[in-house]
């Protein structure tokens, strides 16, 4: 089990007259949606043994609802009148960030069911899509977006127009924006991309939250403190940060790390300075933190108090690295769900009174066919070099309910070259079988029914 070391810092805790809070948070269990895959028959995946049971009365509650398998039924549910509670609350959340920062992984984890495609290749998400979380009287609408990219890169990689415009469009409908940064990427983690800064500057009135993702990949967690300082320009929630860390080892209690983030209020409030302290468990194995003796030592201190606070000029993004208007910061590992529940609770708290947009039975606005295409494409992206997935056209030939209630899907993957066909099929059909098997398993977890998925590969005539 992952060590429960992660922590969250909430600037809101340190309001000028706000109370001091010591926050100790624990990680959550690894998500179960990545089920183990059984062996498959060549070119197809048969019905899977022991599918998850469809709830007798799917709807609101602790389990996210399944997606309807028929396009018509799904459209009826999505367009149907929401089952408004007496005092509904709602929050539309746009998730933006560089390609591959983990936006779709986080969206899936928040939803509790995988409905968005995820892969290690960039530009997995091709257009914006909505996920819906309904919890008691609150509805969160998550807008997963394609990674923010520049028109030049979009042209070079022949990306569809929607990939440039959709993240911006999603901001128009958002009440709050989560900005994801992949902290494991040495090249990009020290600054927000120009596109992210442009997007934030264009919508400065939308509250923004910084989410540092993939912290599980960091050997030295201490660098998070420096990153926070750079990505926020040392200012969060209108106050300057004074980031300091202390590592403490107490032989009578489990070893733990205490990270201290102190906020310095604006000059007029300085007399009421209120620190916000965070406490975490000891960093994971591999961390460079020294806990070998009964010591209390200050390992690093990033004091931003003395630094001149530059006013943020909109349109001046080229010279900037961070955004000084974040209202909060989270550090998490979306892949294994670490601290995702903490973020979810926070988002639920941010919801404002307002009518729900969807019925509580809606999990995503994507149609069943879109979900299926995306999931199959995800596998092709995951296992093949980029030139192959980019050339594949997916044609669904059959989508019908079988005699035992299973969903039968036959999809033809049309490729431009014979060499691509051979790569996609793999030796003795091993790769295409694996793709069908894994996609079938994912679809079963989305639709909560047996799936018979058959994939064919054809060269474009
Ligand atoms: N180790 C680790 N990997 C992660 C984490 N979150 C996401 N990933 C991986 O990062 C890769 C990209 O994840 P996606 O969710 O597809 O990223 P994205 O931002 O939606 O990417 P685009 O749609 O291409 O913009 C995948 O291989 C994920 O498994 C994390 O917290 N830890
Ligand atoms: Mg994505």
Curated annotation (Swiss-Prot):
CDD domains according to UniProt: Era, KH-II_Era
A Pfam family this chain is assigned to: KH_2
GO MF assignments: GTP binding; ribosomal small subunit binding; rRNA binding
Compositional bias (Basic and acidic residues): 269-284, 304-319
Membrane topology per record: Peripheral membrane protein
Gene Ontology CC annotations of this record: mitochondrial inner membrane; mitochondrial matrix
Binding locations of GTP: 97-104, 144-148, 213-216
Region (G2): 123-127
Keyword Protein transport: no
All residue ranges annotated as the KH type-2 domain in the record: 380-461
Biased amino acid composition, Polar residues: 285-303
Membership in a protein family: Belongs to the TRAFAC class TrmE-Era-EngA-EngB-Septin-like GTPase superfamily. Era GTPase family.
Protein name in UniProt: GTPase Era, mitochondrial
Organism of provenance: Gallus gallus
